[in-house]
Amino acid sequence: MATSPPGVLASVAVCEESPGSSWKAGAFERAYVAFDPSLLALNEALCAELLTASHVIGVPPVGTLDEDVAADVVTAPSRARGGAGDGGGSGGRGGPRNPPPDPCGEGLLDTGPFSAAAIDTFALDRPCLVCRTIELYKQTYRLSPQWVADYAFLCAKCLGAPHCAASIFVAAFEFVYVMDRHFLRTKKATLVGSFARFALTINDIHRHFFLHCCFRTDGGVPGRHAQKQPKPSPSPGAAKVQYSNYSFLAQSATRALIGTLASGGEEGAGSAAGSGTQPSLTTALMNWKDCARLLDCTEGRRGGGDSCCTRAAARNGEFETVAGDREPEESPDTWAYADLVLLLLAGTPAVWESGPQLRAAAEARRATVRQSWEAHRGARTRDVAPRFAQFTEPDAQPDLDLGPLMATVLKHGRGRGRTGGECLLCNLLLVRAYWLALRRLRASVVRYSENNTSLFDCIVPVVDQLEADPETQPGDGGRFVSLLRAAGPEAIFKHMFCDPMCAITEMEVDPWVLFGHPPATHPDELLLHKAKLACGNEFEGRVCIALRALIYTFKTYQVFVPKPTALATFVREAGALLRRHSISLLSLEHTLCTYV
């Protein structure tokens, strides 16, 4: 028991009549299918708990700032209050969205302390609390083969899913579901309530299942173990050291971006990377190419050959062909993830067009978070993780205006060029019908005009055509078109033609893994599929980690713009890496300086 992480021991020793009783009757009777939208309906209280856990927690500012200090320090987050559709401030294509609020203004919350606590999760030498929780269950209860099969299914789906807010939320929900499925009835142990008490956080889920991928077995280069003559490692464990260097880069970038929630205003977006970030991050960013080179599937291939991305693109084409021949009848549960995306992103910089549905979703989220925060107040007071103790104070509360930023990949609230750090369209890739629809939408935009009409100018007419012809839409009650309208043409343009993060995410998403497994209606085949995943223990990504190193460097430079010489060097090196992987994008300079 001495190895249990702070706060988790209590969370696995509660009785079934308390938090675990929020599961609906029969919730664990069905066969487990990872990333099944219908699972979200089995525990509304857990959904509310995770939605609350996705928010930054604010506390009243300590004292009143002196005038001299207030002139230099801004404790309020940079995200403009009031939602994405307000249209206030200088929301031009290249400028800040709104001026930062007065840190001493009445009613504002100080998000600095929570940002500092959240940053600590992404320290390279901090243990993974998801791994520690699993180890604690293993020591206390033992892990059955059935649990291993279900957990392996969840891990495989996370490797094939887009890195986005919806995926992180679903992974958090289903991790709790898998643990409670196997230990609630027999051991009276539940993880429901652990996020409310900060025993686990949404950042722990992000780090374990997506950022570091603690279960990944390919060392960051897909197919490495399948090579007939793998390159000899210079020393035992060299592959893990190389992967850890990438993890340091990614986690350092994430820490810096979280820090913008407390660093004050928009000045970080215009400051040089050398002055606006920690020296360790600056060094890591400058050395991103060396980090990527060791994890690049194209490194050392003088004769060319297929890259991870060309193989992924070919497999995507195969899936589209097969899926187009026999598209299944979508069940109403399919669109639960579309509604989840709307709930998570309404009123954030990911959505720039306002409307009744968006305002209703944002208000529903705020009401749910308020209620859940109050419902767990007593549990937080009795048992909270020590580093989050100050957030049990009566005046501490979620920052509802910022929204669920902790569930997003980049965890900052910046907006520029009518785009935000979280891409709405990347979230839609989690739905089979939308994965197909987005591919068809891009093809329609490209071939819309035979003349030299710009790609950007083709987007709105194509969306108009899609809206006018229900036969070409997914049978989702108009959700897809509504979400495209909410994102706006700039976000669509950025996703399809400009942003390396979006382009690489489309390569990472594996439709065969997400949608090509046996359904729950074929229990024997499904059980065999999960058993193969568990016994094979081959959890490989779809693209090499070199591209992820590029993503985190690029996204950090969008917020902390480097000096011109460093920027030019990065653009040249990043462009070369993308070309080696057959990824064609519009000007990286344009994307760096115009969007975020």
Curated annotation (Swiss-Prot):
Span list, region Zinc finger 1: 128-214
* Positions of region (Zinc finger 3): 308-581
Quote the record's binding site residues for Zn(2+) 1: C128, C131, H208, C214
Which residues hold Zn(2+) 3?
Answer: C308, C309, C544, H581
Keywords for the protein's UniProt record, in alphabetical order: Host cytoplasm, Host nucleus, Metal-binding, Zinc, Zinc-finger
Q: Where in the cell is it found?
A: Host cytoplasm; Host nucleus
User: Where along this sequence does the record place binding of Zn(2+) 2?
Assistant: C423, C426, H495, C502
Tell me the domain of life: Viruses
Query: Which PROSITE patterns did the record assign?
Result: HERPESVIRUS_UL32
What is a single cellular component term in the Gene Ontology annotation? host cell nucleus
Q: Any idea which GO molecular function terms this record carries?
A: zinc ion binding
For the region Zinc finger 2, give the residue spans: 423-502
Spell out the InterPro entries in the cross-references.
Herpes_env (IPR002597)
| Region feature (Disordered) | 76-106
Which regions are flagged for Gly residues bias?
A: 82-95
Instruction: Give the protein's function.
Output: Plays a role in efficient localization of neo-synthesized capsids to nuclear replication compartments, thereby controlling cleavage and packaging of virus genomic DNA.
Q: Which family does it belong to?
A: Belongs to the herpesviridae UL32 protein family.
Q: What is this protein called?
A: Packaging protein UL32
